[in-house]
Regions:
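An anion-binding catalytic pocket shared by soluble metabolic enzymes
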Residues: 22-114, 121-132, 138-139
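Generic structural signal for well-ordered, non-membrane alpha-helical segments
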Residues: 19-26, 41, 91, 95, ...
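Glycine/small-residue-rich hydrophobic helix-like segments
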Residues: 192-221
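A contiguous pocket-lining binding segment that forms or flanks enzyme active sites
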Residues: 145-198, 205
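Generic N-terminal amphipathic, Lys/Arg-enriched alpha-helix
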Residues: 2-16
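Flexible, glycine/proline-enriched loop segments at strand-loop-helix junctions
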Residues: 16-20, 85-93, 146-154
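Class I SAM-dependent methyltransferase SAM-binding "motif I" and its flanking Rossmann-like core
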Residues: 119-161
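Conserved small/polar residues in nucleotide/adenosyl-binding loops
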Residues: 219-228, 236
Length: 236
């Protein structure tokens, strides 16, 4: 039984309308991740940088399931891991390391970060080949997908620079032997990209289970007549 104060409500008087709207969107994204079955108990994280000059971002409270996340119980922290608001919750340190690595750069393109440990995502992350361009979803990541070598649980701050270096200017990354990660300018942007990456991995695992992976058509480069790849949300 979960004895954490799920119904905790943050003091709205200290929160701007812009931040509150961001909280609502991020909490909704947590519910969608739960709806699609992408959760791994209480692990994995979706975070969003709070608008303003301070390096603050929102993260899920440690110990709550995704279907328990609300706009009020999201935790606001800085890139050093300090909790900003008065809250009874703690945060997951490994999640802090991964997400603060991206938020500390303060890129307008990477305001939102989403990271999952799905079965299919981890299966693809554990292969030497990585993601193969065999579907309309995975082809949208052709030459647009980063990879990060596995260093064990992300508990040490010095990994942050290597995470940033691995991501580069890409908007999606496979953490080898670990899981999936997407970034975006907005919550919907990052979520749509995550959906495409998750579907890509599901299709690849299904093709492998059917014994047809070796006969799949591998996409190589866009045709001058086909601009589909540039229009896919995951590649924008």
């Amino acid at each position: 039984m979960n004895h954490l104060p799920v119904d905790f409500k943050v003091d709205r008087s200290n929160i701007s309308d812009t931040e509150w709207d961001l909280r609502v969107q991020l909490a909704a994204a947590y519910r969608l991740v739960d709806y699609f079955g992408w959760t791994e108990l209480i692990y994995g994280h979706l975070t969003a940088r709070v608008p303003g000059p301070e390096p603050h971002f929102l993260i899920n409270p440690y110990g709550l399931n995704y279907d328990e996340i609300t706009a009020s119980n999201l935790v606001k922290i800085d890139v050093d891991g300090a909790v900003i608001d008065d809250t009874p919750f703690e945060i997951n340190h490994a999640g802090f390391v991964i997400h603060s690595a991206i938020h500390m750069k303060h890129s307008e393109e990477n305001q939102v970060v989403m990271h999952t440990h799905t079965r299919e995502g981890m299966a693809v992350a554990g292969t030497k080949e990585g993601l193969l361009p065999i579907s309309m979803f995975s082809t949208s990541f052709y030459k647009r997908l980063a990879y990060h070598e596995y260093e064990g649980p992300s508990l040490f701050l010095d990994e942050r620079e290597r995470l940033l270096e691995s991501l580069g200017d890409k908007k999606a990354m496979i953490l080898k032997n670990h899981g999936l990660l997407t970034v975006g300018r907005t919550v919907p942007d990052a979520f749509i990209r995550l959906h495409a990456l998750e579907r890509s991995c599901q299709i690849q695992v299904d093709a492998g289970a059917a014994g047809t992976l070796n006969t799949c058509l591998l996409y190589t480069s866009p045709s001058p007549r086909d601009k589909t790849v540039s229009r896919m949300p995951s590649s924008a």
